[in-house]
């Protein structure tokens, strides 16, 4: 029902955060909000729970922080009074973005509403439509009490009428508003949006930075009392070096300056959508799912994975290059240190943690582990830090098993989609691995609901490295539900057991390897990987790129550099061959690890395979061969973690598995190149130029992005018709293996038969163009030198054009798009595509995450255009630096 005069929705088209609400008047006395309300952030973080005091009563106390002399065998603390585990948010639950003005809430709301097909609503705009005045003007006319009452009424109506399918922006802080938001937290995500002081200061036009800092701290403390999640909106600043050098180099190439604001918004878009994907049920954000092979395998299900451990203090001091952390790592563990002696988690410290989490998420794609070091007997402070960590929605969060059952159950009940690692590192005099102490803690972690158990023993002798297998054998032999076990010895003498640990071994960044403390990781990811080969657990393998003419391929340089960076002693070399007949010996070699397949064999190579992925089947082409050495009991090829956990070991090849990663690379390029204004909608249109194997991969990539309108141009119309018929048939039979549920909109295709033919009236102009025709002479066939009709580049919001070749980067259609870059057109070429599809191949060949930044850099470093002698990296470096978007 409509109340308080709310007649209609307050949609995103008019959303602009009003500057005329006096922020200072809304926080007349910021100091009174210093204390964080325990109802949200303390033991009663769920609004439905009663507030529990932080006392040293038996229920909360850890009488001693050292380990007990005997194993923990006491029965669990009675928990009848504890609430049930907080259920996941409904997929259609509306999301509130709350926070101080200038934090970027409106921009984030529009980004999310477009991606999730939701309404974007703004409380201030709603207030103006109801009252005819801004909040500030209304307060001056009617007084603060009446203004606050009307604000509360407006927000109540918005929440009641839009409990589903909306993004709601709120900057108000009145007590009635807080109460409404706190109640909404019971069943909905209410996200506190934070930003750095300078951005807030500029937006609110506050001259005194200290005053702005005080205002931000006070408002943050207040908003944390009525929100259940937190997101730090990292401010991007343009690098002057990139701006000037990119402009100079692009101008020399006849192009335009890269659009820095576009790049900034793209990174914010990926960061925020990634965050929402972690708090909402899977499928809530259409077509955001990763296409990369390892993304579908939980990290804890893979073998020999590494979590690179970095302290919060080193990150705050800018001692580490965040992007370099990914090389060889499967997760990043943020170790929240320096809390011994603290009496509370203050607002500034909470914001620092949120900023670091945001910065890492914005620059990397691997999951985060949030680990707080439990100080001596300061469990209340520890709980504050843990509950704050849960607000940031890390993929993993550790809990110290020295806490009592009530505390552990409370944390686990609040985890939502985060996975909890029960962690224990006892004192140096801990019992041997054969002692029941360790198994009792594993059982306790499992019984209380932890998702993993991590037990780390300070090493006392070399024998400890072998004794840890006793615990692993006991766990393996145990009955009932099992959780993954992380168990090894710490310290330099414990490195052997750490290297042999299967799941999320903590490792140290390369620059810090020489300064390890006894209680810290003493292995790097590279050292741990090398240990697996030096101990003959893994074998050096052979990889190839096959094709008719692959001597110019950049794949060997790219993959060789990646293998070396990860400590993997495999080889990767090109093999040019006129036919597939000569490849039998290579692919049947016991040391064969996989191959990239080039032209003209992407279809013919299917005859060598025993099984194809569902994507390769849909496309009808293969660009990746993977040997299978272990089959399922029924003789089929495994498609889960078993396919990856058997990598890097020599043996008879029992089957060949065919995959297509070209579509993954094209999809990644399109997602990187599409501005938020051109985000895929039901009316979006894509154009495919060509009808060969790569054109099929490009078409498939657009379908995986949710594109429902696809136009095809090919010189030979019959081939275009054949391709359209193929995908139309798959679509109508619902045989397309889409990563996301398809929208209830029929996919339409249109074939343009000649370049003189006008653009079809019932199709919008394309915002995605993929050119799949050759860019250079092939034998006696000259390069086509294809020029597109200028109308094809007429989209008022620009778009993304991808040229798949890289032998030349100066094709006519690329130059056409560069000439209109000022209208929003972004160009990409084979130097963008090759690494993107190569990341997926690297995962398939090795079972490890690809070092993406390094592989991109190596492609640019190795590239040498025909007939030109220049330092490639110097001119391509700005392009590399401007790549800010990564596929998860």
Predicted regions located by residue number:
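Rossmann-fold NAD(P)-binding glycine/threonine-rich loop
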Residues: 627, 643, 777-859
């Amino acid at each position: 029902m409509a109340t308080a005069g709310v007649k209609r929705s307050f949609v995103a088209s008019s959303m602009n955060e009003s500057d005329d609400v006096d922020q200072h008047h809304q926080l007349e006395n910021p100091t009174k909000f210093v204390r964080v309300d325990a109802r949200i952030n303390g033991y009663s973080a769920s609004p439905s729970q009663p507030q529990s005091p932080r006392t040293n009563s038996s229920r909360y106390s850890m009488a001693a922080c050292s380990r007990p002399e005997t194993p923990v065998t006491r029965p669990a603390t009675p928990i009848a009074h504890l609430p049930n585990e907080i259920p996941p948010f409904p997929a259609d639950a509306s999301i509130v973005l709350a926070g101080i003005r200038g934090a970027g809430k409106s921009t984030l709301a529009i980004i999310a509403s477009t991606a999730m097909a939701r309404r974007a609503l703004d409380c201030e705009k709603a207030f103006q439509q109801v009252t005819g005045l801004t909040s500030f003007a209304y307060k001056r006319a009617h007084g603060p009490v009446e203004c606050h009452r009307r604000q509360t009424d407006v927000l109540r109506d918005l929440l009641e009428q839009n409990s589903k399918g909306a993004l709601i922006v709120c900057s108000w802080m009145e007590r009635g508003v807080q109460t409404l938001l706190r109640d909404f937290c019971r069943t909905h995500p209410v996200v506190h949006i934070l930003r750095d002081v300078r951005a807030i200061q500029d937006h609110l036009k506050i001259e005194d930075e200290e005053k702005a800092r005080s205002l931000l701290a006070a408002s943050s403390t207040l908003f944390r009392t009525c929100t259940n999640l937190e997101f730090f909106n990292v401010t991007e600043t343009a690098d002057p070096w990139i701006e000037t050098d990119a402009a100079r180099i692009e101008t020399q190439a006849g192009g335009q300056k890269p659009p820095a604001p576009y790049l900034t918004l793209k990174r914010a878009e990926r960061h925020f959508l990634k965050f929402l994907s972690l708090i909402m049920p899977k499928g809530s954000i259409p077509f955001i799912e990763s296409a990369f092979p390892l993304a579908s395998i939980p990290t804890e299900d893979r073998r020999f994975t590494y979590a690179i451990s970095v302290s919060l203090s080193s990150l705050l001091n800018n001692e580490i290059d965040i992007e370099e952390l990914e090389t060889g790592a499967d997760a990043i563990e943020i170790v929240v240190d320096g809390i011994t002696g603290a009496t509370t988690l203050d607002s500034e410290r909470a914001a620092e943690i949120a900023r670091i989490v945001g910065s890492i998420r914005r620059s990397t794609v691997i999951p985060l582990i949030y680990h707080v070091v439990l100080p001596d007997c300061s469990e209340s402070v520890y709980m504050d830090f843990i509950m704050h960590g849960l607000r940031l929605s890390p993929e993993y969060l550790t809990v110290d098993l020295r806490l009592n059952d009530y505390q552990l159950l409370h944390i686990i009940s609040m985890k939502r989609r985060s996975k909890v690692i029960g962690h224990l590192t006892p004192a140096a005099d801990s019992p041997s691995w054969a002692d029941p102490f360790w198994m009792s803690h594993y059982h306790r972690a499992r019984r209380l609901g932890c998702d993993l158990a991590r037990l780390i023993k300070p090493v006392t002798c070399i024998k400890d490295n072998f004794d840890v297998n006793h615990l692993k054998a006991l766990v393996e032999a145990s009955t009932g539900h099992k959780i993954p076990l992380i168990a090894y010895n710490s310290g330099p003498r414990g490195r052997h057991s750490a290297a042999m640990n299967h799941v999320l071994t903590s490792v140290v960044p390369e620059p810090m390897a020489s300064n390890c403390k006894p209680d810290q990781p003493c292995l790097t990811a590279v050292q741990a990987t090398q240990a697996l080969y030096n101990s003959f657990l893994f074998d050096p393998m052979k990889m190839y790129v096959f094709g008719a003419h692959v001597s110019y391929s950049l794949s060997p340089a790219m993959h060789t550099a990646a293998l070396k960076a990860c400590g993997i002693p495999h080889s990767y070399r090109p093999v040019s061959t006129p036919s597939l007949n000569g490849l039998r010996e290579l692919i049947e070699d016991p040391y064969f690890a996989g191959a990239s397949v080039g032209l003209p064999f992407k279809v013919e190579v299917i005859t060598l395979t025993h099984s194809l992925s569902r994507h390769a089947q849909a496309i009808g082409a293969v660009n990746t061969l993977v040997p299978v050495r272990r089959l399922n009991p029924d003789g089929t090829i495994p498609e889960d973690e078993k396919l990856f956990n058997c990598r890097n070991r020599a043996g008879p090849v029992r089957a060949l598995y065919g995959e297509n990663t070209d579509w993954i690379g094209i999809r990644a390029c399109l997602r990187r190149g599409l501005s938020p204004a051109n985000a895929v909608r039901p009316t979006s249109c894509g154009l495919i130029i060509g009808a060969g194997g790569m054109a099929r991969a490009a078409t498939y990539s657009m379908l995986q992005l949710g594109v429902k309108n696809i136009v095809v141009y090919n010189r030979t119309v019959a081939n275009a018709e054949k391709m359209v018929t193929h995908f139309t048939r798959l679509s109508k039979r619902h045989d397309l293996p889409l990563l996301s549920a398809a929208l209830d909109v029929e996919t339409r295709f249109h074939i343009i038969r000649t370049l003189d033919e006008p653009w079809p009236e019932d199709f919008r102009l394309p915002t995605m163009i993929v050119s799949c025709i050759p860019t250079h002479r092939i034998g006696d066939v000259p390069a086509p030198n294809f020029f597109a009709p200028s109308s094809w580049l007429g989209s008022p919001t620009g778009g993304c054009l991808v040229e798949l070749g890289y032998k030349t980067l100066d094709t006519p259609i690329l130059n056409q798009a560069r000439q209109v870059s000022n209208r929003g057109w972004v160009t990409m070429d084979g130097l963008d595509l090759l690494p993107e599809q190569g990341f997926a191949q690297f995962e398939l060949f090795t079972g490890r995450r690809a070092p993406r930044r390094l592989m991109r850099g190596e492609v640019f470093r190795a590239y040498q255009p025909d007939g030109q002698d220049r330092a490639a990296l110097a001119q391509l470096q700005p392009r590399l630096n401007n790549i800010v978007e990564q596929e998860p």
